[in-house]
């Protein structure tokens, strides 16, 4: 990414700065969601892997109160359930990949791990890629902004995948250069012109998975929801054809 846009960064002809940040997972140690105009964050789209034997060993050792207080009750979408036999069920469709349950259980894995067993208590899925979030910034004209999900999932394994993200970054830079006001960050431009217009300008189709604030609001107008849902399913069918 740096090599592709080094000339633009060295001789910026932009209304204001444009930050790129990359984080390997949703823990986001780079603070990219809060600070980056173009954030690339590692994620996965299949199910969380559960080592039920180690999970049960942890429940037996730590107790149900610990598990509920520190893990399951802190799931932001209440997607975790401990069954009567102390096994764990995760509603993966409602999982928002926040990493909390993995963060809590990861340091405990070594305590319960069997000889030769290398699987952690909980682990990310195998179908990995990145999500792209745009518009994050600290205080300037309109205060702090978190970025909005623009690409919910993109594979990042081949040279072609890298070219796609470079092309998208180029579209964003060009659109920002042509449409942003002086001393205006990407997030402020999106707030001014609307996220739908921004997506059209960079050539990305509207997707119901693009969210502004999880579980509270979506930029997709609900009065046109049925029409937008039909478009999304048609586009998804064409992509899979």
Task: Give the ranges of each region predicted by the language model.
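Inter-heme linker and motif-flanking segments adjacent to c-type heme-binding CXXCH motifs
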Residues: 80-86, 110-116
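General structural feature for long, well-ordered alpha-helical segments within catalytic domains
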Residues: 1-5, 67, 71, 97, ...
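Flexible, glycine/charged-enriched surface loops at secondary-structure junctions
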Residues: 14-18, 83, 178-192, 209-220
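A hydrophobic, small-residue-rich beta->alpha segment in the mid-to-C-terminal subdomain
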Residues: 127-128, 136-180
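Short glycine/threonine-rich loop-to-helix capping motif typified by GTGT followed
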Residues: 31-35, 97-100, 190-209
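Generic secondary-structure signature for well-ordered alpha-helical cores
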Residues: 10-14, 73-76, 80, 100-106, ...
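Long C-terminal interaction/binding lobes of large macromolecular proteins
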Residues: 199-241
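Small-residue-enriched alpha-helical segments and adjacent helix-cap loops
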Residues: 1-69, 74, 83, 89, ...
């Amino acid at each position: 990414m740096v090599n592709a846009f080094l000339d633009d960064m060295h001789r910026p002809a932009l209304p204001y700065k444009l930050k790129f940040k990359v984080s390997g997972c949703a823990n986001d140690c780079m603070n990219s969601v809060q600070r980056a105009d173009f954030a690339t964050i590692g994620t996965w789209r299949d199910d969380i892997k559960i080592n039920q034997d180690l999970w049960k060993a942890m429940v037996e050792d730590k107790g149900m109160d610990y598990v509920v207080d520190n893990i399951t009750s802190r799931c932001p979408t209440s997607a975790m359930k401990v069954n009567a036999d102390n096994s764990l069920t995760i509603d993966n469709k409602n999982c928002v990949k926040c990493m909390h349950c993995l963060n809590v259980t990861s340091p405990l894995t070594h305590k319960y791990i069997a000889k030769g067993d290398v699987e952690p208590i909980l682990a990310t899925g195998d179908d990995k890629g990145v999500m792209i979030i745009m518009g994050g910034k600290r205080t300037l004209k309109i205060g702090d902004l978190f970025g909005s999900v623009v690409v919910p999932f993109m594979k990042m394994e081949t040279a072609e995948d890298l070219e796609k993200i470079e092309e998208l970054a180029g579209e964003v830079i060009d659109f920002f250069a042509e449409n942003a006001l002086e001393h205006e960050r990407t997030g402020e431009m999106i707030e001014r012109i609307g996220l739908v217009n921004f997506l059209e300008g960079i050539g990305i189709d509207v997707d119901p998975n693009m969210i502004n604030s999880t579980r509270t609001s979506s930029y997709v107008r609900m009065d046109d929801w049925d029409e937008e849902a039909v478009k999304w399913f048609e586009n998804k069918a064409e992509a899979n054809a």
